[in-house]
Amino acid sequence: MLKGRYIFSENGKEIYRSENVVTLYGKRFLTNFIAGNIIDYRKDLAFGIDSTAAVDNDTRLGFEFYRIPVEFGTTDIYSDDNGIKYFVVYKTVLPVDLAGVIKEVGTYPSRRTSSNSFDSKFISDFSDSFAWRDSESFNPERSSTGALIGEDVLSFTSGVGTEKEYFCTITESDFSGYSVNDSIRLSYYKNDNNLEKIKIRFYSSDIAYYEVEINDNSGTGNKISDDILLSVLYAGANSENPDISKINKIGIVVVPKTGLQSTVGMDGLRINDEDSFDPTYGLISRSVLSTPLTKVIGRLVDVEYRMELSF
């Protein structure tokens, strides 16, 4: 039987622990590792903001925002009244300049055996207000309200009864290697009940873009969109024939309800590779914290993953 837990400590004192689920991939990975079929022993710990319950068929964190290599791996063997216990232990340290609300944590191998230029990644973490502008070249304001990734969100505000778009110019990027089964997700903070929907646009020129919509008519507070398949994005091409291999700008449109104005705090936008197969790479373990752990700048936090092996 495999059991594991993640332990968070500060200044040598434990501040939190959370039990994990070893995934189906994790069980295969460990079996292959013992058999000598996996040579690279290095691991990463990943941290995210999604609180969806962990299950053994998880293939990734719900919404990852930070990943760091394991600094130290060892074993721990001791006996108690219940017999001898065997542990594999991985340790790392969250740096002082990291800020975020940790709701989930997972373990991955550090490397793939196959090359993949279209991996899961951030499109934007909305950390730079000067990178975004509206049609009049005004930058959005920063706000600490609702921030899960970093210390702030960017406040995107609509007009009164009219939609408003914010743009971010990026280095021309080729998204053509992502399949229709891959997905994007948006993390945001809904400040009011005046929001009708959010549009996300991927531009290959000033007039040619792909578009998806997030309809939101329920409550306020922190939100993570459902997985939006890229098949939906590709189907949302406008009539100007956009080119998915030459994306150079991202647009986000805030659409308010009739006669109202809405402000949305933008927190993170990710693209997730859902269907690339690598027999030596995947999510080994995932844990969802029952109470989120807030990591603030200026504070070192030690993280330890202890996997118990029963023979």
Question: What role is predicted for each listed range?
Answer:
Residues M1-K103, Y108-S124, F130, E136, ...:
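Small cysteine-rich, disulfide-bonded extracellular modules of the LU/uPAR three-finger superfamily
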Residues S115-F277:
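Beta-rich carbohydrate-recognition modules and glycan-binding surfaces
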